[in-house]
A protein has these predicted regions:
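Short acidic/polar alpha-helix capping motifs at helix-coil junctions
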Residues: 5-10, 24-26, 39-42
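The canonical Cys-X-X-Cys-His
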Residues: 18, 22-32, 77, 91-95
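Axial heme c-ligation environment in periplasmic c-type cytochrome domains
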Residues: 38-45, 65-98, 103-105
Length: 105
């Protein structure tokens, strides 16, 4: 873990769906609960990813197209196959609830 976080006692229904999808599709790189992994991928529970800097559409584009490294030195993120926009929206809901619970916004 690259950051220490607190997890909420409960999530909205959409965020619960997002949590399951995140653990299946994102956690291998970004770590369980989006805390990042040294040498692999950054934490998403970080001020860099707050909604005014990386809006929801930025997450949609990153999943669909991949993204060139620009804030961290982890290398480029590849596109993630097998997720619909609606599923990514649920993942975003999960990440945003974690961010909010940890004072990111």
């Amino acid at each position: 873990a690259l950051v220490e976080i607190k997890t909420p006692k409960s999530y909205s229904e959409n965020a619960r769906i997002g949590l399951r999808l995140f653990e299946a599709k994102c956690a291998d790189c970004h770590g369980s609960n989006a805390v990042g992994q040294a040498g692999v991928a950054p934490p998403l529970i970080h001020i860099i990813y707050e909604p005014n800097h990386h809006g929801d559409e930025s997450f949609q584009r990153a999943v669909a197209l991949g993204v060139r490294a620009h804030h961290w030195k982890f290398g480029n993120m590849p596109a993630v196959a097998g997720l619909t926009r609606a599923e990514v929206k649920s993942i975003i809901a999960y990440v945003r609830e974690l961010q909010r619970h940890n004072g990111i916004f």
